[in-house]
UniProtKB/Swiss-Prot annotation:
One of its GO terms (cellular component) is cytoplasm. This is Chaperonin GroEL 2. Forms a cylinder of 14 subunits composed of two heptameric rings stacked back-to-back. Interacts with the co-chaperonin GroES. Coiled coil: none annotated. Gene3D superfamilies: GroEL, GroEL-like equatorial domain, TCP-1-like chaperonin intermediate domain. Disulfide bonds: none annotated. It is an enzyme of class 5 (isomerase). It comes from Corynebacterium glutamicum (strain ATCC 13032 / DSM 20300 / JCM 1318 / BCRC 11384 / CCUG 27702 / LMG 3730 / NBRC 12168 / NCIMB 10025 / NRRL B-2784 / 534). Its main location: cytoplasm. Keywords: ATP-binding, Chaperone, Cytoplasm, Isomerase, Nucleotide-binding. InterPro entries: Chaperonin_Cpn60_CS (IPR018370), Cpn60/GroEL (IPR001844), Cpn60/GroEL/TCP-1 (IPR002423), GroEL-like_apical_dom_sf (IPR027409), GROEL-like_equatorial_sf (IPR027413), TCP-1-like_intermed_sf (IPR027410). Together with its co-chaperonin GroES, plays an essential role in assisting protein folding. The GroEL-GroES system forms a nano-cage that allows encapsulation of the non-native substrate proteins and provides a physical environment optimized to promote and accelerate protein folding.
Length: 548
């Protein structure tokens, strides 16, 4: 395909225009008075959301240079979402502010590499200041406040805090397993069930059943546990046929699934003949065997292993485990409500406790405690209901974000919310870090950009951004604007806080992309095809698949 190339100012301005288009659509959602954005879908009802990364994913621009600019900012939102689970809109607003100020200085003759170094040094100092200011989360009320802000509903925040305590063994734990399900009832209900999550995802992306969320959801599946590798489909075929006749999906957990066995499962999944997901077993060596046995006890199945005289060819349905639901992403697998007996699970838990007491190795004890938490902790299920499907999807998305937000708060602590932590951390840059020239310019760009989230929150609340930023900069540490009612308060005392992990990630990712923008000297893009040239001749007549 032919390419088009833009250089210098033309290249950077094209990228900036794409960034601004995306950022302007996203930033209206920031803060308690933020608005919603309606996203049209190819089929079904439109989605209404105030989640930055969801909005960013939907934006596709026509101009090739603008499209690249928008894609770069999408990366900021996606990376922040992946790392922290929230803060995507803040990251986008920061990126826009950094790029706008940076390009203005580059156009005026500043050296982009000097500015880049200044930005990096300033961000490192601000990050350090944020981590120093962070307070550890110690109470259920603090988690409820953090999650409640993310979900824009204090009642949901309280349910999430309750869920974290319920499956964390009576204490806050960032590894608490909390899933969100759609329900036919109104409101949000909490249910704690037997279950487990381990950090292995699907072997092939083709197993995903929900392409938008890139996850595979199996309802009431059989679970096949195998200690070795599966590569020969002939070994697996007799069991597959029995599972197919039962009409249930199948989750396979083994050392690996490869070759013709994997390709057969994928082809049948794509054709809709048989729904299955293959996942690598967690751990290595003896730990893998032990964890497979944990899953077997939890699901009421048996591990197929030659050590106990069981083989795939002779395996039957009674050897398979079962669960109410299994959710598999690219990174982890969650088993909800396994069919194992209470007595066997309790016996396994006691056995692990004895092993912990008898172990001399700190590392072994740590791994055994992880297994104990997974087996004994269970899974908290938040069931979400709403009047319409559109509202239900939006609510579910908000709650999932709030859960990840709460976990981030437990992990690294919390700082004052509402954009105030960033603005007040900017004081560390007051003397330009004693740098000079273009590096000092980079520091000043960061200092100015750190006011952008607070200004946007104020603007969305109908207040004058400059006046609010000036007022907050003069307030004592931790005090700032409560945009919900327009009052200036002690934000931590009022329960208005953000996980420092979210704030830190938003700044670091925004600065990373801004540095790329400023140091770009050429952009190579695909040349747009003339209208009507994109379709292949005869594709319609052949059904678009060559007649197969």
């Amino acid at each position: 395909m032919a390419k088009i190339i833009a250089f210098d100012e033309e290249a950077r301005r094209g990228l900036e225009k794409g960034l601004n288009t995306l950022a302007d659509a996203v930033k209206v959602t920031l803060g308690p008075k933020g608005r919603n954005v309606v996203l049209e879908k190819a089929w079904g009802a439109p989605t209404i959301t105030n989640d930055g990364v969801t909005i960013a994913r939907e934006i596709e621009l026509e101009d090739p240079y603008e499209k690249i600019g928008a894609e770069l900012v999408k990366e900021v939102a996606k990376k922040t979402d992946d790392v922290a689970g929230d803060g995507t809109t803040t990251a986008t607003v920061l990126a826009q502010a950094l790029v706008r100020e940076g390009l203005r200085n580059v156009a005026a003759g500043s050296n982009p590499m000097g500015i880049k170094r200044g930005i990096e040094k300033a961000v490192a100092q601000v990050t350090e200041k944020l981590l120093e200011a962070a307070k550890e989360v110690e109470t259920e009320e603090q988690i409820a406040a953090t999650a409640g802000i993310s979900a824009a509903d204090p009642a949901i925040g309280a349910q999430i805090a309750k869920a974290m305590y319920a499956v964390g063994g009576g204490k806050l734990n960032k590894d608490s397993v909390i899933t969100v399900e759609e329900s036919n009832t109104f409101g949000v209900e909490l249910e704690v069930t037997e279950g487990m999550r381990f950090d292995k995802g699907y072997i092939s992306g083709y197993f995903a059943t929900d392409m938008e969320r890139l996850e595979a959801v199996l309802e009431d599946p059989y679970i096949l546990l195998v200690s070795g590798k599966i590569s020969n489909i002939k070994d697996l075929l007799p069991l597959l046929e029995k599972v197919m006749q039962s009409g249930k999906p199948l989750l396979i957990i083994s050392e690996d699934v490869e070759g013709e066995a994997l390709s057969t499962l994928v082809v049948n999944k794509i054709r809709g003949t048989f729904k299955s997901v293959a996942v690598k077993a967690p751990g290595f060596g003896d730990r893998r065997k032990a964890q497979l046995q944990d899953i077997a006890v939890l699901t009421g199945g048996q591990v197929i292993s030659e050590e106990v005289g069981l083989s795939l060819e002779t395996a039957d349905l009674p050897l398979l485990g079962q669960a109410r639901k299994v959710v598999v992403t690219k990174d982890d697998t969650t088993i909800v409500d396994g069919a194992g007996s209470e007595a066997q699970i309790e016996g396994r838990v006691n056995q692990i406790r004895v092993e912990i007491e008898n172990s001399d190795s700190d590392y072994d004890r740590e791994k055994l405690n992880e297994r104990l938490a997974k087996l004994a902790g269970g899974v908290a299920v938040l069931k979400v209901g709403a009047a319409t499907e559109v509202e239900l999807k939006e609510r579910k998305h908000r709650i999932e974000d709030a859960v990840r937000n709460a976990k981030a708060a437990v992990e690294e602590g919390i700082v004052a919310g509402g954009g105030v932590a960033l603005l007040q951390a900017a004081h560390v840059l007051d003397n330009d870090l004693e740098l000079s020239g273009d590096e000092a310019t980079g520091v000043r760009i960061v200092r100015e950009a750190l006011t952008a989230p607070l200004k946007q929150i104020a603007a969305n609340a109908g207040l004058e951004p400059g006046v609010v930023a000036d007022k907050v900069s003069q307030l004592p540490q931790g005090e700032g604007l409560n945009a919900a009612n327009g009052e200036y308060v002690d934000l931590m005392a009022a329960g208005i806080n953000d996980p420092v992990k979210v704030t830190r990630s938003a700044l670091q990712n925004a600065a990373s992309i801004a540095a790329l923008f400023l140091t770009t000297e050429a952009v190579v893009a695909d040349k747009p095809q003339p209208a009507g040239a994109a379709g292949m001749p005869g594709a319609d007549e052949m059904g678009g698949m060559g007649g197969f």
